[in-house]
């Protein structure tokens, strides 16, 4: 996203939409390539966790995309800058855990999952990202999921969440940026798929 804004000079909303489109490609590709190291059967067996987070993230993604289309460019840029700072802090401190069990149980866990999903869906939609930066720490810390499995579960949550945000953005006239920059989008998507393939293959070698 910063590259789209600073290096390529896209307006804030256009950059978010472009980033969302390319992230959707990456998530789809990564989900496939990771299946060798994390079987889809294992992902499917944790469907309740995925559903719990989706209950909030779908609403958050749709709502936040609506906000983004109404905000002025400068306002959206300030929101993006603040959220990127928050994500940086989460990335710095959010993965240091060896949790093996859920932090909460029963209705409390469900409520916390919906709330976390709502927040993550909104942030992901506003930044045009998949949300794994926040989903993985949430899955590890809140649900006690293994880090490798958390990566695949985050993709299972991200894909429907991104589709929801993408559908809302498609109603705005800025969505035409995808058609106007088709060659750019395709080249970035191709590179992203290649990177996702390398990452998926390397996952099996990482302890």
Regions picked out by a protein language model, each given a short descriptive name:
Residues 163-171:
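Membrane-water interface of transmembrane alpha-helices
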Residues 2-7, 11-12, 31-125, 141-142, ...:
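Juxtamembrane transmembrane-helix boundary motif
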Residues 1, 126-138:
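Transmembrane helix boundary and interhelical junction motifs in multipass membrane proteins
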Residues 16-27, 151-162:
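Transmembrane helix-bundle signature of multi-pass membrane transporters/permeases
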């Amino acid at each position: 996203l910063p590259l789209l804004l600073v290096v390529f000079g896209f307006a804030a909303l256009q950059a978010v939409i472009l980033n969302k489109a390319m992230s959707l490609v990456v998530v789809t590709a990564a989900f496939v390539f990771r299946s060798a190291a994390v079987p889809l059967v294992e992902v499917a067996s944790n469907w309740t966790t995925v559903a719990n987070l989706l209950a909030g993230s779908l609403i958050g993604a749709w709502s936040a995309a609506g906000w983004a289309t109404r905000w002025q460019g400068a306002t959206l840029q300030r929101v993006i800058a603040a959220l990127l700072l928050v994500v940086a802090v989460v990335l710095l401190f959010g993965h240091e855990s060896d949790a093996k069990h859920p932090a909460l149980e029963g209705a409390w866990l469900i409520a916390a999952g919906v709330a976390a999903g709502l927040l993550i869906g909104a942030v992901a939609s506003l930044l045009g990202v998949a949300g794994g930066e926040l989903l993985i720490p949430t899955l590890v810390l809140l649900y006690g999921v293994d880090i490798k499995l958390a990566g695949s579960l985050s993709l299972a949550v991200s894909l429907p969440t991104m589709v929801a945000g993408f559908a809302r953005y498609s109603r705005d006239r800025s969505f035409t940026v995808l058609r106007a920059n088709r060659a750019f989008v395709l080249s970035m998507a191709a590179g992203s798929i290649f990177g996702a393939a390398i990452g998926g293959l390397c996952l099996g070698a990482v302890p």
